Amino acid sequence: MSLNSIKFEPADIASLYKNSLVEVNTKQQVLPETKTNAEPIATGWKYLGENKKKTLVVVRNADAVHIPDKQLSFLTKLLAACNLNLADVAIFNFQDHNSSEFNEILNFFKPKVVLLFDVEPGEFGLPMIFPQFQVQGYKDVMFVSSPSLDVIEPDKSLKGKLWVCLKKIFNL
């Protein structure tokens, strides 16, 4: 096996290069890892969908149990463009939760992809901060952070940025 034929996963490359490969003017802020209880907490998380393809959609909405109808309609169109439907994902409202539940959420849903809408990575419990519309790997999960679905829907440039991320994640 030659060195030229070695294939690395994106998460492996990210762990090899903790600092940027390219110098930029802004520094990425790293959050300290939060300590949680070692015991898993058995909880009945409320979510919409069947999570068949291990894709977790995290939203924040105080006015709905899961997601308002208008946002659900837009999200359904986004999922259809990615060859997914509501049965393939779990829609989780993060409104009444906090970062201390990060490990429990990951252990319960066991996602391969997490789409954060109106929830910052650090707020969700990730030990790093990354810009919106950047695909970021952590613990064998691909994360993308973006504004709320209400903000994205009318804005073509934001939709385009999200679409670039979705194409990368779902190999479209």
Show the residue positions of the predicted features.
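A polyanion-binding, active-site-adjacent surface
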Residues: 2-172
